[in-house]
């Protein structure tokens, strides 16, 4: 059973997360060869102030 953590900067809609979750689940089913109901996704929304890229 894969447990996949997805961290995103806040601001994504529920629909965007749903579509991303469906795509990730399909990839896990195709690549790891597990049934879709065995794939667990955990979405974490990060505040923009809690994220930094390139030291900025």
Feature names for model-found ranges:
Residues 2-56:
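A domain-level signal for the structural core that forms small-molecule/cofactor-binding pockets
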